[in-house]
Amino acid sequence: MAAAGEGTPSSRGPRRDPPRRPPRNGYGVYVYPNSFFRYEGEWKAGRKHGHGKLLFKDGSYYEGAFVDGEITGEGRRHWAWSGDTFSGQFVLGEPQGYGVMEYKAGGCYEGEVSHGMREGHGFLVDRDGQVYQGSFHDNKRHGPGQMLFQNGDKYDGDWVRDRRQGHGVLRCADGSTYKGQWHSDVFSGLGSMAHCSGVTYYGLWINGHPAEQATRIVILGPEVMEVAQGSPFSVNVQLLQDHGEIAKSESGRVLQISAGVRYVQLSAYSEVNFFKVDRDNQETLIQTPFGFECIPYPVSSPAAGVPGPRAAKGGAEADVPLPRGDLELHLGALHGQEDTPGGLLARGHAPHCPGACQRVEQGCAEFTDVLLGPPPPGYHPFLFLDSLHKKAGGRSRGGLHPRGTPPTAQEPPGGSRPEGRATEEQAAAAHLGEYVLMIRDVTTPPFLGRRLPPAFKHLRVVAKRAGQPPHVLEEGPEASSSWQAAHSCTPEPPAPR
């Protein structure tokens, strides 16, 4: 019984094979004791040596060269946890040297690596398709490099830890160019910009913005400007900074001159009470800072022009034509109306021409030979006849008559009309009364995303004296005081109640 029982399977314990040892030489497969690693490939003296494939239980793997049991040489490594794959040179298990990294999230890198990180010169395409070519340090863009952004902008210059810093040139997709200093990815320091609109700025930049940027438009001259009926005049404009200094670092903004006529006149200052506008020619009222409203009125400046923009100092010159949209602007655009040239002609307005625009040069601009024309079709002046009827003992105070029934503002009180050339000049001139000049920033596209607020000048058209020369606005504070002294007989209109 005992002899028979020794040979039965039930009487023997489970058979355990001794652990396999790695192959000595040649090709072999070895599963490590912890079963996480599996190697298939060439062996030499019991070590992985030559070409082989090391598989990890989580799905990661390396396939390539081995030297004395270590991953060294050319190979391909895939990380299951990230999905990234590197093909290139390895030293002691880490990417080292030159190779290509493909990212699961999108994009790839080709270039030099050290200890598994981008180091040295390389070519990077990110998940958004943006391309960088240049120096890397500690896995970041660092040193000189070029970048093509998703929106089409191109940067060529210095980088510090993935940010543009130092000196660089940015060429935007819209045609704008910045050359100068950077800090923390924004314009900072001395630099110049040639904007696609034609605006140029050369000077100091702080946190991405010009340190000497224009913030407002100012029309030089007295508080209330008087011009003779039918006479051309000049308008000088300055762009000022917040603290009142002229923005001399800036050139190229396109300024448009336009005018409005006072919608309700006061009897003390004009015989014209207001303009009645036909229903088909209704205009939106323009609010002015003078306490009254006005409606658009035609103005011309035939001597004005819009020269091509000049590049910033140190940059290449460029001639950018005035955007076509600017040529079609008209007075109604001041309050948001959108009219085509054909629509303006149908309504009696001439389409806007380049003569009404002027480019700024070092913070200053001048409009010469500015002239207020006759009222457009559909504008009918009404006369305030209070003063006339007081003298003539006429009807009750405040009577209103449309032009053509009583003596008009162009006629002497006695009713006799001037003859010949004088009559023609008056017919082609603006009526006596209260007007407003407006200077508007129409730079397209707006410089750095914003336009300057419009500037206003109170204008009074008075009867022309014989031999009176054209009016020219002088500059400086002395001009305002001397003008007011010379015209002290003209009272200022009271604020509306």
Curated annotation (Swiss-Prot):
Gene3D superfamilies: Histone H3 K4-specific methyltransferase SET7/9 N-terminal domain. It comes from the Eukaryota. InterPro entries: MORN (IPR003409). The keyword Repeat applies. Keywords: Repeat. The keyword Transferase does not apply. MORN repeats lie at residues 39-61, 62-84, 86-108, 109-131, 132-154, 155-177, 178-200. Residues 1-27, 393-425, 468-497 are annotated as: Disordered. Pfam families: MORN. This is MORN repeat-containing protein 1. It comes from Homo sapiens (Human). The gene is MORN1.
